[in-house]
Structure formats: C-alpha cells, structure tokens
C-alpha cells in the first residue's frame, strides 16, 4: 500500500503532462509559428478550399497535368488510407501495373516522343505525393496544350514558374506541385 501513492502520483503527473500540457503546447506553438502548415497547408480561393499543397489530387482530364499514381485503395489520394502498395520490384503484379500505366499514358499522350517518366507510372511511398519533376510535367505539355488551346511556350513558362528547387542545392531535385500547377491552369481560362 505504501508504494501505491508514489506510483499513482507519478501516473497522474505523466498523464497530465503527456495528455494535456504537451498536446496543448504543441498545438499553440504550431498555430503561432506555422499557422498555414498546422492547418493542413490548404490552398484557398476566397472562402473555397481547392486542395492542399501537401496531398495530390486525381486530375484525369486531358486539360490537366497528371501526377504520380495513387497507391490508396478505393479512392485515389485518400489521406485516411495512406500507404504504399508494398509490391516488391520482383513482384509480377507490379510489372503488370506499370505496363498498364505506361499503355494508358501512351494512349493519352500520343504526341509525347520520349519514354514515359518513371514517376508517372510508380506510386510514392505514401501514395499521396503531389510533386513530379519538371521533366515529367514537360512530357505532358503536348496533351495539355492541345486540350486547352495553349502554346507549348506558355505551358513551359508555367511549369518553370511553379517549379521548386530543393532546400539544399545538391540534395534532391526540382519538383512541380501538380495541384498548384493545375489551379494556375484553371486561372488562365478565367
């Protein structure tokens, strides 16, 4: 009975710290220092949320740039089902998926002359990635230009405008946020 009081007081102290003080403190600091990120990095147009800068969307029309395939089950880019496909490189099912994706991309992009960029046929580890390389976006220019009656030069400039350099120059590669790029495309039509 003697050891019960210190154990109970330690339990209550840790419960208060880890269940109350720490979550409230991190929430307050996050809202204070990083309000945009703490609230989901939402892209807004007026009062309307158009997407998140961190999660891809399923753009399927010919007038949009397409991102990486989503690995989430049931519905593409579902953040509640985040996770990779977990198919090994040696798995024949992965080969079938990639072959089907390449065939679909070739059919949708008949004017593209080079090989299909790898990130357009392979899902990311989270299954929610919204970034592709500027080269993968440029590969899709003929299809988007034709669907939107825009010039190749206009789309090349738009890709360059929305390309982001890596945080450290020699680590990583430039990327294009597909959600932001496609929203910019929609603004061109207005």
Swiss-Prot record:
Pfam family, one: KdpC
One cellular component term from this protein's GO annotations in UniProt: plasma membrane
A GO MF label: ATP binding
Compartments it resides in: Cell inner membrane
Keywords from the named record: ATP-binding, Cell inner membrane, Cell membrane, Ion transport, Membrane, Nucleotide-binding, Potassium, Potassium transport, Transmembrane, Transmembrane helix, Transport
Keyword Transferase: no
TM spans (from-to): 10-30
Membrane topology: Single-pass membrane protein
Top-rank lineage group of the source organism: Bacteria
Function summary: Part of the high-affinity ATP-driven potassium transport (or Kdp) system, which catalyzes the hydrolysis of ATP coupled with the electrogenic transport of potassium into the cytoplasm. This subunit acts as a catalytic chaperone that increases the ATP-binding affinity of the ATP-hydrolyzing subunit KdpB by the formation of a transient KdpB/KdpC/ATP ternary complex.
Protein family membership: Belongs to the KdpC family.
Subunit relationships: The system is composed of three essential subunits: KdpA, KdpB and KdpC.
Protein's name in the database: Potassium-transporting ATPase KdpC subunit
Source organism (scientific name): Escherichia coli O6:H1 (strain CFT073 / ATCC 700928 / UPEC)
């Amino acid at each position: 009975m003697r050891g019960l009081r210190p154990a109970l007081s330690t339990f209550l102290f840790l419960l208060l710290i880890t269940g109350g003080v720490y979550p409230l403190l991190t929430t307050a600091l996050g809202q204070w220092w990083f309000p945009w990120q703490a609230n989901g990095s939402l892209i807004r147009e007026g009062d309307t949320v158009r997407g998140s800068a961190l999660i891809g969307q399923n753009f399927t029309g010919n007038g949009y740039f397409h991102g990486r395939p989503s690995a989430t089950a049931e519905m593409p880019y579902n953040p509640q089902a985040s996770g990779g496909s977990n198919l090994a490189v040696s798995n024949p099912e992965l080969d079938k998926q990639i072959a089907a994706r390449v065939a679909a991309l070739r059919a949708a992009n008949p004017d593209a002359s080079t090989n299909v960029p790898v990130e357009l046929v392979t899902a990311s580890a989270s299954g929610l990635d919204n970034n592709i390389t500027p080269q993968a976006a440029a590969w899709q220019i003929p299809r988007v230009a034709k669907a939107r009656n825009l010039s190749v030069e206009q789309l090349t400039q738009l890709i360059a405008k929305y390309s982001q350099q890596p945080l450290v120059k020699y680590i990583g590669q430039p990327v294009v946020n597909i959600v932001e790029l496609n929203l910019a495309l929609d603004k061109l039509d207005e």
